[in-house]
Amino acid sequence: MNKINLEDKIILAIDGLNIQEAKLFLERCPNIKWVKVGLELFTREGPNVIKFLKDLNKKIFLDLKFHDIPNTMEAACYEVSKLGVDIISVHASSGYKALTSSKNASLDGANLASVNPPNIVGITVLTSFSSEEFRNDLDRKNSIEENVVRLAKLCFDAGLDGCVCSPWEAKRLRSIYKNNFELITPGIRTKTQNKDDQNRIMTPYEALKNGASRLVIGRAISKAKDPNKVFLDICNSIY
């Protein structure tokens, strides 16, 4: 794998910034190709942030984690797909009907807007959950990994393009789905970084070795004094 391909595998989370701050930040990070827009940033700035990032020729992971009844998810995916984003996240636990409706609606919306259709990925179990919290807070009898495997299968059967999981589960999922199913992994931390509010974490090298397709990295880069250097250092540490 060459360094150019590695740059395409890292998605920078910029949720803590407004548009002007994001503009200044991305000017300092010319090597970054992918940007994640989450609920905080999209709620603050709305669709304008998508237009802004597209004008910078960035690829966009719109991580709004839609989770609602099928009709509402269908309508939401239809609308945001018209913005020309590259990946949209929905909660896998919304069920088969909601997932298939979301996928089909994204194709229709993109077609209407004459943009490329986005990949739809399903959120399995949030990386902020520890095993104890997952068992006690949600009253789940099965392990996190077993639930991730079950939800990933639901995504695959519903025709989604991939799922979001922690790097801990990526190895097992990759053994099941080989290379025709995208595995996006948050919970990425460098060896010197605090885990913050994440629990099931790995280094970038470990996550890719486990089968992750793309890595979502936020504070390790966004809080750095020289973010572009840190980004390239991460690429070099994997290469």
UniProtKB/Swiss-Prot annotation:
Give me the segments passing through the membrane.
Answer: none
Q: Which residues bind substrate?
A: 15, 36, 63-72, 127, 189, 198, 218-219
Keyword annotations of the record: Decarboxylase, Lyase, Pyrimidine biosynthesis
Q: Is Nucleus there in the keyword field?
A: no
Q: What is its EC number?
A: 4.1.1.23
- Kindly list the GO molecular function terms attached to this UniProt entry: orotidine-5'-phosphate decarboxylase activity
Q: Name one GO cellular component term.
A: cytosol
- According to its UniProt record, in which pathway does this protein act? Pyrimidine metabolism; UMP biosynthesis via de novo pathway; UMP from orotate: step 2/2
Q: Does the keyword Lyase apply?
A: yes
Q: Tell me the domain of life.
A: Bacteria
Pfam family for this entry, one? OMPdecase
Which biological process annotations from GO are given for this protein?
Answer: 'de novo' pyrimidine nucleobase biosynthetic process; 'de novo' UMP biosynthetic process
Q: Which InterPro entries match?
A: Aldolase_TIM, OMPdecase, OMPdecase_AS, OMPdecase_bac, OMPdeCOase_dom, RibuloseP-bd_barrel
| Annotated catalytic residues | K65
Instruction: Quote the catalytic activity from the record.
Output: orotidine 5'-phosphate + H(+) = UMP + CO2
Q: Describe the subunit structure.
A: Homodimer.
UniProt xrefs under PANTHER family? OROTIDINE 5'-PHOSPHATE DECARBOXYLASE
State the family it belongs to.
Belongs to the OMP decarboxylase family. Type 1 subfamily.
Q: What does this protein do?
A: Catalyzes the decarboxylation of orotidine 5'-monophosphate (OMP) to uridine 5'-monophosphate (UMP).
The molecule here is called: Orotidine 5'-phosphate decarboxylase
